[in-house]
Amino acid sequence: MAKPVIVGAVRTAIGRSFKGALANVPTETLATTVLPEVVRRAGLEPAAVDDVVFAELNYGGGDLARHAAVACGMETVPGQAVNRHCAGSLTAIANASAHIRADMERVLVAGGVQSLSTAPLMKWRKPDSGPEMEFIEPWIPPSHPETPDAPTMDMSVTVGWNTAKAVGISRAEMDAWALRSHQRACDAIEAGKFVDEIVPLKVTRADGIVLDFAVDEHPRRDTTLERLAALPVLHPEIEGFSITAGNSSGINDAGAAVALVGDDYAAAEGLEVMATVRAWANVGVAPRDTGLGAVKVIGKVLERAGLAVGDVALWEINEAFASTPIAACREYGMDEERVNFSGSGCSLGHPISASGARMVTTLIYELRRRGGGIGVAAMCAGGGMGGALVLEV
């Protein structure tokens, strides 16, 4: 049985949705940027790829992975689209790893892309409302009337606020975590830590100037506790509500992908192994407790990998809201210095379907800089889920 290993990892820089550098870049372009680049960096022949597995939450044009493969001249390579909301690209990597472990395929590319800027709106007709319809964002559809807690499915409630209430996290603590996130992300950018993992993407500005977009644009060096404290809460009608735009993740655009092969294939072809995929896991929780999905899945994935918290060198716990990593640190007694070492969702942003692969990519490059070790990427996922992946460099 082959061990799944990663032989290439790449991402685009993360753009701010709607008015950022990637606002007019189609989803397909994000995919056709990271796919050929990760194949090239891995030293693979495009025709050797057995399958492309991409996550994209709201792509309206069918199988994005296959479209990307064809557009990149890989017509003999099939593709499959997956969707596990925020954890989609973690699932893509896990599915590819499972195929390798089962000796079904030898070479795969897995990842995810997200362009919330260009996401198509969809029309929604409420039951028994007659012909009247309204436009809504497809990544946050209205709750099904039979879903428990349907009126409270807003992510700032189910991920941010309910987690903060359950664990007893104050707004001051969440704001402090968000500030830390921006500071760490800005420090990483200024130190050039992301240069190796980012593939520049040519974009055309509104004034016609073409530039290479290669620096994450969401982190803000001018973030302060005072500015965060001055932001209004998102639901003032809820007593004690403490979630703001500042201690939440951004709305963003990006793409990320990794190339996976079996360890035997890597040895035979002389490929450089960047990381081994040790384990992966997913959990379900009540939709009202979505934020706790990231907390619960950590215990499950560590058990599968046969590891203890102290065995992990670095953690990437997605900051969909600041309350999530804080809750995980409390639950497992983590060393916070090892958590979100270069920022996360509050600062870098959260390009939903790309975030998992982005986290894996950043983990790999940082662990390599530090001489290796075990890394864990974990995140909650919309609808009441959590996903996680364990790597060893």
Predicted regions and their residues:
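Condensing-enzyme catalytic core mediating Claisen C-C bond formation in acyl metabolism
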Residues: 1-27, 165, 224-292, 296-299, ...
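Conserved catalytic cysteine-centered active-site region
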Residues: 55-107, 150-156, 222-250, 331-358, ...
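Short, well-ordered amphipathic alpha-helical segments that serve as non-catalytic structural scaffolds
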Residues: 27-42, 64, 68, 92, ...
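Active-site pocket-lining segment
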Residues: 159-161, 197, 205, 278-347
